[in-house]
Amino acid sequence: MFDEVVIAVLVNKTKSTLFTVPERIEMIGEVTKVFPNVRVDSWSGLLVDYCEANKIDIIVKGLRAVTDFDYELQMSQINLQLKGIETLFMSTAPAHSFLSSSLVKEIASYDGDVSNYIPAPLLEKLKARLALVHGGN
C-alpha cells in the first residue's frame, strides 16, 4: 500500500505511559525489523507538524470501535484543515477490536495471560516493568 511506513511515537502530555519514548521506539523497532520499509521515529508536538516536516501526505489510523471513530474523525478533519494532511482509517481485526493498552496492562498486572495480545519479544519487558511499577505485587 505504501513504499515506506513511518511509525511515529508521539509525546502526549495528557497520557501517562509505562515506557519512555526511547524504550517504545526500541520495542517497536524490535518487532518491525522484519519489514524493511518500516521506519520508527519520535516527535514532540502535533502529528501534522511531523508529517509536514517529513513530507508525509497520509496518516493511517486503526479503528477499534465507534468511539474511536468519533474522536479520530474530529482529529482527521482538523489535521486536514491545519495542514492538508489526509487520514486513512483501517478497521482492526474483530478478534482485537476490544483491546486497549490499558486493558492489556491491567490483565498483565494481575498475572493474567496477555501472550495473545502483544508480540512475544515484548511480553517479558511488560511483566518486568509492571513488577517494578507495582513493587512486585
Describe every region a protein language model picked out.
Residues 1-137:
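Nucleotidyltransferase catalytic core that binds NTPs
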